[in-house]
Design a protein with these regions (language model features):
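A short, structured surface patch at a secondary-structure boundary
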Residues: 114-177, 219-227
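Short beta-strand/loop motif that positions the catalytic acidic residue
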Residues: 205
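Short, glycine-rich, amphipathic interfacial segments at transmembrane boundaries or analogous
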Residues: 12-13, 18-20, 81-123, 181-200
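Hydrophobic alpha-helical segments characteristic of transmembrane helices
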Residues: 2, 8-9, 137-140, 184-187, ...
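A hydrophobic, helix-centered structural microdomain
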Residues: 40-105, 141, 213, 218-233
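Proline-centered helix-kink/hinge sites
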Residues: 9, 62, 78, 137, ...
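N-terminal hydrophobic signal-anchor/signal peptide
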Residues: 1-61
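Short, conserved catalytic or interaction motifs in soluble domains
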Residues: 152, 188, 210
Length: 233
């Protein structure tokens, strides 16, 4: 009497900050509190995105100019790396990043996952990845509405097609706009395997279910720590 009873998925979610994919049922995704967002939530998030991206571009412009010069000095090729990514509801957009790999890094191999100690990465690129400064041009993607500041990281369409066949509920992560940074990025180490993708999906589903301005601010603060202490990839 007076004791709250929770099912296992709910208890696991609260204890770990992620949703256990192996225990999910389609009905739970439909009826569980949190997955259906109101128009008010979407408007607030968009205002947050536009404000933060606008201020970020203005403040980061001198740093972005220095990064562009460093990339040009070290290696030939374009400063920006532009690549198709799967966005909200599977719509493909062009993602902008500072180039961190040598030019034509995938020539002869086709699309492959980045590795932790990737031999294709330049010295400047390695620093940019550790500090996540390579993501700064994506502020423009946020302003254009392709991305949100906070959300699941966008994957390449080729990887999405492959992963959705191997991981249950993988496409649920496309129900919101992808982000420059996200819950999975601040809670989980870098990984490039199917097992890593499952783990990151569990964090992404938690974010989607519990999406709020407070959670976005929490992720943003954690991301700032990653940038300051170079704890990225």
């Amino acid at each position: 009497r007076g004791i709250a009873v929770e099912d296992w998925p709910t208890f696991y979610e609260k204890a770990t900050g992620k949703i256990l994919v192996a225990e999910l049922r389609p009905s739970w995704l439909i009826f569980a509190d949190g997955f259906v967002k109101t128009a008010r939530t979407e408007v607030i998030k968009r205002l947050f995105d536009v404000t933060l991206a606008s201020v970020g571009l203005i403040l980061a412009f001198p740093l972005m100019a220095l990064v562009a010069i460093a990339i040009k000095i070290e290696s030939s090729g374009p400063v920006l790396f532009r690549q198709p990514r799967s966005g909200q509801n599977g719509c493909v957009f062009i993602l902008n990043k500072f180039r961190s790999m040598r030019q034509d890094a995938e020539e002869g191999t086709g699309p492959v996952w980045a590795q932790k100690a990737d031999p294709r990465v330049t010295r400047v690129g390695g620093f940019l990845r550790r500090t996540r400064l390579d993501e700064l041009p994506q502020l423009l993607n946020v302003l254009l509405g392709h991305m949100s500041f906070i959300g699941p990281r966008p994957e390449r369409p080729e990887f999405v097609q492959s992963l959705q066949k191997e991981i249950p509920y993988y496409m649920k992560r496309l129900s919101v706009k992808p982000g420059i940074t996200g819950w999975a990025q601040v809670k989980y180490r870098y990984g490039a395997s199917v097992e890593d993708s499952i783990e990151k999906l569990q964090y992404d589903l938690y974010y989607i279910k519990n999406l709020s301005l407070f959670l976005d601010l929490l992720i943003l603060l954690n991301t700032v720590q990653v940038v300051l202490f170079a704890r990225g990839r």
